[in-house]
Curated annotation (Swiss-Prot):
It comes from Bacillus subtilis (strain 168). This is Uncharacterized protein YqzG. The lineage of its organism: Bacteria, Bacillati, Bacillota, Bacilli, Bacillales. Gene3D superfamilies: Protein of unknown function DUF3889. Coiled coil: none annotated. InterPro entries: DUF3889. It comes from the Bacteria.
């Protein structure tokens, strides 16, 4: 009987501390967003304020002497509706000043 109680106490001590450490360490670390990715998400949230961003991906980018363009595809959920939008950002590559932002909802 005494051995059984010692085994139970020891197992609680070992597994209890392991569980406490597991809660402290995050399972998934947040990925750092680039400046332009943050702008794309912010602009999409302006147009769709109640939407939740599920997924974001850079589709393409182009850099010329006087203009750079980046396009992102965002998957959004608004209520039960799930849809995609393309956010295209045009900016000056030297000053980083935004020239134009276009948001186009993906055709369903």
């Amino acid at each position: 009987m005494m051995i059984k109680q010692c085994v139970i106490c020891l197992s609680l001590l070992v597994f209890g501390t392991t569980a406490a450490h597991a809660e402290e360490t995050p399972l998934v670390t947040a990925r750092h967003m680039s400046k332009w990715e943050e702008i794309a998400v912010k602009e999409a949230k302006k147009r769709y304020p109640l939407a939740q961003v599920l997924f974001k991906q850079k589709v393409w980018d182009r850099k010329r002497k006087d203009e750079a363009v980046k396009q992102y595809h965002l998957t959004l959920r608004e209520g039960s509706k799930e849809f995609g939008v393309f956010v295209t950002i045009s900016f000056d590559p030297y000053s980083q000043k935004v020239n134009k932002i276009a948001i186009l909802e993906e055709y369903q």
